[in-house]
Amino acid sequence: MVFLSGNASDSSNCTQPPAPVNIPKAILLGVILGVLILFGVPGNILVILSVACHRHLHSVTHYYIVNLAVADLLLTSTVLPFSAIFEILGYWAFGRVFCNIWAAVDVLCCTASIMSLCIISIDRYIGVSYPLRYPTIVTQRRGLRALLCLWALSLVISIGPLFGWRQPAPQDETICQINEDPSYVLFSALGSFYVPLAIILVMYCRVYVVAKRESRGLTSGLKTDKSDSEQVTLRIHRKNAPLGGSGVASSKNKTHFSVRLLKFSREKKAAKTLGIVVGCFVLCWLPFFLVMPIGSFFPDFKPSETVFKIVFWLGYLNSCINPIIYPCSSQEFKKAFQNVLKIQCLRRKQSSKHALGYTLHPPSQAVEGQHKDMVRIPVGSRETFYKISKTDGVCEWKFFSSMPRGSARITVPKDQSACTTARVRSKSFLQVCCCVGPSTPNPGENHQVPTIKIHTISLSENGEEV
């Protein structure tokens, strides 16, 4: 939000000559604010590129995170530089018209950033509460509508002062005031902060309650399963095994339970990461939105200029630290950031044009730093994919659930050794995959997605060896 010089409310109607610049103070402020801006601009660009360059991050949740990064990028690139110049010089040097436009863009970006966190909290609540139904509830079309409404509301809140909803501006154009009209301050504080904050807190309280309940239920379900449920095992059998009626029902129940546990674990992890983001948001913005209404409605209790500057820049700090939070709390983003910085995502995009699918590397047959007998599963157009996070990166596998009958063909050797096993050790769990298919496709083979069945998925967060 836009800052008001401490003597602006007492300013005269004539233009005052600007005071001389304090050089040591200007250098110190320039270094501090410059570092802040240099963290914010590249950091938010890195978030956007990380999602754009990695297909496994192309989800509605990550689109919301990109929207948050876009709002923060606009703030750090178009608003903060002029705020820094204003602080260093001690007066506004860009004229009255640009002051009004700059103030409106400031409110627009800050409001959009805060409302993005609000939408993300709602998304996480749905993801944790309904992990299996989440893809049908949160679709890309609904996500796009939510983002359009977000920017429309932010625009409505920000343009009021441009149409006269403000106190009279001083004639001195070296002063750029914050809008202290009490009615607008109340409207903007409620719309930009307090209503979104209430929604965020309610959603994350619900997420906490649901996560505790689901964790308790899923843990008790694991204890009643087989004794080897302390590992995470995924077996994709080469063909559907014949089962009796009770065996089929038991297999379906176990598969449903295990898939729910896998999806719930992922949603819970994402909620933790975004919970840290929201916690930092409250710490950064709450002081400003406490000080601003108090100064507007109770001028006698208006804080000093130094206090206002601190809480003012503390709010701006929130838009600069979000890109730091992601890699520190999410292995997924950490690896994506590293790939972007190493320009690996561009190479992956070029190589993916010639690839038929994704590859699983069996470590039991791998030499140090090399992989042999790769198992390749061709990519289809109607698949549902899950992500496996490893300590050294992100591995993807695909579960094809909606392919029509007869559309997939694969040659299955009779030799049992053709079923290759791949192990992936993770920070929180171990995955063992038994996948169907030859190492290299046959020339005359139809490269469609093979019809596969998940026989057993059992989970644990201990990550013990099989």
UniProtKB/Swiss-Prot annotation:
- Does the entry feature the keyword Cell membrane, yes or no? yes
Q: Where in the cell is it found?
A: Nucleus membrane; Cell membrane; Cytoplasm; Membrane, Caveola
Q: How does it sit in the membrane?
A: Multi-pass membrane protein
Glycosylation is annotated at: N7, N13
CDD domains reported in the protein's UniProt record: 7tmA_alpha1A_AR
Which purpose does this protein serve, as stated in its record?
A: This alpha-adrenergic receptor mediates its action by association with G proteins that activate a phosphatidylinositol-calcium second messenger system. Its effect is mediated by G(q) and G(11) proteins. Nuclear ADRA1A-ADRA1B heterooligomers regulate phenylephrine (PE)-stimulated ERK signaling in cardiac myocytes.
**What are the top taxonomic ranks of the organism?**
Eukaryota, Metazoa, Chordata, Craniata, Vertebrata
Subunit annotation: Homo- and heterooligomer. Heterooligomerizes with ADRA1B homooligomers in cardiac myocytes. Interacts with CAVIN4.
Q: Which family does it belong to?
A: Belongs to the G-protein coupled receptor 1 family. Adrenergic receptor subfamily. ADRA1A sub-subfamily.
Q: Which residues lie on this side of the membrane: Extracellular?
A: 1-25, 90-99, 169-181, 298-304
This chain's protein is named Alpha-1A adrenergic receptor
Native organism: Cavia porcellus
Give the lipid-moiety residues, type S-palmitoyl cysteine.
C345
